C-alpha cells in the first residue's frame, strides 16, 4: 500500500500517513486549541484515548479538512509534511539560515553577530556560515519578513520557501502541516 503513495513499504510510514490524514488531535500544536470554538473542551478531551477520535473529527470539520486526504508522497517535499512540529520548526530555521548564508558570511564580528548567535544558537550560526555553503548552489530567494527577531526571521524565510515548494500538493497538505506549528 505505501508504495502506491510513494513511501517505503513500512508500517511506520502507513501509520504516519493515517495519523496525518485522520487524527489531527495527535499532532495539533497546543496553541490551535486557543483559536477554535470550544477549544478548551477539545484540549481536555484530546488527552482521553476514548475521545481523541471524536476530537479529531471535530478538528477536521473545523479546519475544513473532512473528506480530503493527502495520498501522494512520491515527492520528497511532500514528505516534509509528515515531520512533527518541532522538527518542522528546526527545518524552517535551518532552511532560512541556508537561504541567507551569503549574507551571514559577510557579517563582521560585532554586536549584530553576537545577537544573532544568541538568537539562533552557536550551532545555528556555525551551520549558516560553515556548513550551508557546502550544500552547493543556494537559490536566490527574495522574501523578507517584518520582524527584528533573528530566529523568527530565519524561521519565516524557511517556512515561506517550503510553502512555495509545497503549494503544488494542495491546500489539505499545507493546512495539516500548518496545524503542527504554533497558531
Predicted features along the sequence, with ranges:
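General marker for long, soluble alpha-helical cores
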Residues: 1-183
